Amino acid sequence: MEQYEKEEKIGEGTYGVVYRARDKVTNETIALKKIRLEQEDEGVPSTAIREISLLKEMHHGNIVRLHDVIHSEKRIYLVFEYLDLDLKKFMDSCPEFAKNPTLIKSYLYQILRGVAYCHSHRVLHRDLKPQNLLIDRRTNALKLADFGLARAFGIPVRTFTHEVVTLWYRAPEILLGSRQYSTPVDMWSVGCIFAEMVNQKPLFPGDSEIDELFKIFRVLGTPNEQSWPGVSSLPDYKSAFPKWQAQDLATIVPTLDPAGLDLLSKMLRYEPNKRITARQALEHEYFKDLEMVQ
């Protein structure tokens, strides 16, 4: 740790405190994430160290770079490249963003590039949300933070400061208790983020797991064996769920053009293996005029 000098606390993430710090060797500003482990007394699990070490090999322009992993008996520090703006802060401070379909398209494309890269390396995120999409103010590059951390450390129900970890971007198969989920969970989150960029408000802002499910069902219809084969055998599925009819997405995201609505509907498919992949999404016609954008 001697190599890094903490300058100020910049946030409290899902896993612990985040500091802005300086690398004394290179004089570079970095983000230092202190991971608080659930079982404090047991020290750092070797599986977590292995998982995290793999993430150091991830190099992509749309992934926040993990420079270093420092671990002592009791805790882990992760050293990341430093970016001071995230998509949530950007949307909150810049309401006119919704009127810039070109920038929305560019950001969505970059999110998908980062997700496609991670999925091609068999790494899931599981907790994608606007707060962990970081923006470089100078270049408008968007980068995904915290990829792979869920597998190493699990996703707590509450952060270490007792804030509830958001459910707004969580895929229905996870909410219904599936243990067999895979890369489609991240594509669901991307769909929720896409709609939020366009509408300037969250698509499914549930405040509990059941409220989250019902907010989804009210828009997409309550799933059944016809719309989602196998749904009734998921652990937390109840035949007594209220039966809502699907709404037209065009009424939910009224300013999105037809190509965008088509892409969004493919991201928000109930059946995980029918959900569009990141690779497929990058080829979607919604992006056909992107060359002029970038």
Curated annotation (Swiss-Prot):
It catalyses: L-seryl-[protein] + ATP = O-phospho-L-seryl-[protein] + ADP + H(+); L-threonyl-[protein] + ATP = O-phospho-L-threonyl-[protein] + ADP + H(+); [DNA-directed RNA polymerase] + ATP = phospho-[DNA-directed RNA polymerase] + ADP + H(+). Keywords: ATP-binding, Kinase, Nucleotide-binding, Phosphoprotein, Serine/threonine-protein kinase, Transferase. PROSITE patterns: PROTEIN_KINASE_ATP, PROTEIN_KINASE_DOM, PROTEIN_KINASE_ST. Its EC number is 2.7.11.22, 2.7.11.23. GO terms for cellular component: cyclin-dependent protein kinase holoenzyme complex; cytoplasm; nucleus. Expressed in the dividing region of the root apex and in differentiated cells such as those in the sclerenchyma, pericycle and parenchyma of the central cylinder. The keyword ATP-binding applies. The modification Phosphothreonine is found at T14, T161. The keyword S-adenosyl-L-methionine does not apply. ATP binds at I10, G11, E12, G13, T14, Y15, G16, V17, V18, K33. The active site is at D127. It is an enzyme of class 2 (transferase). Phosphorylated at Thr-161 by CDKD-1. Residues 4-287 form the Protein kinase domain. GO terms for molecular function: ATP binding; cyclin binding; cyclin-dependent protein serine/threonine kinase activity; protein serine kinase activity; RNA polymerase II CTD heptapeptide repeat kinase activity. The modification Phosphotyrosine is found at Y15. Induction: By submergence. Down-regulated by cytokinin. GO terms for biological process: G1/S transition of mitotic cell cycle; regulation of G2/M transition of mitotic cell cycle; regulation of gene expression; regulation of meiotic cell cycle; signal transduction. Belongs to the protein kinase superfamily. CMGC Ser/Thr protein kinase family. CDC2/CDKX subfamily. This is Cyclin-dependent kinase A-1. It comes from Oryza sativa subsp. japonica. The lineage of its organism: Eukaryota, Viridiplantae, Streptophyta, Embryophyta, Tracheophyta. The gene is CDKA-1.
